[in-house]
């Protein structure tokens, strides 16, 4: 028995297939899903979704959204997502370093829309970098 996983973004169907295990980056921490899991709805944080299918792990960078688990079906609706295998690891690392520098440059400044945006870009760059490295 396996799970059916669907990862949907506004512009694409990122993943649609079966999985033995799914680990979601929920807003309250990592959430592991196996067959027979109780039905639930959870908020998804910016992070990496991990999928185990046929003994191997794959990663998907998620940029926030929601997930529903019901009758061994996991549906993840996100703002944006990328398969780890399609992310250029070197470019993701460079984006992460650039975002880290931008956030560090705002250290000690009062809260502002620019500071919030910089932190969000850092979180997204971190997720992309982690997903690209997990794809190896």
Swiss-Prot record:
Family matches, as CDD domains: F1-ATPase_delta
Main location: membrane
Subcellular location: Cellular thylakoid membrane
Superkingdom of the source species: Bacteria
GO cellular component terms, A-Z: plasma membrane-derived thylakoid membrane; proton-transporting ATP synthase complex
Region (Disordered): 104-136
Keyword DNA repair listed: no
Function: Produces ATP from ADP in the presence of a proton gradient across the membrane.
Family (UniProt): Belongs to the ATPase epsilon chain family.
Name assigned to this protein: ATP synthase epsilon chain
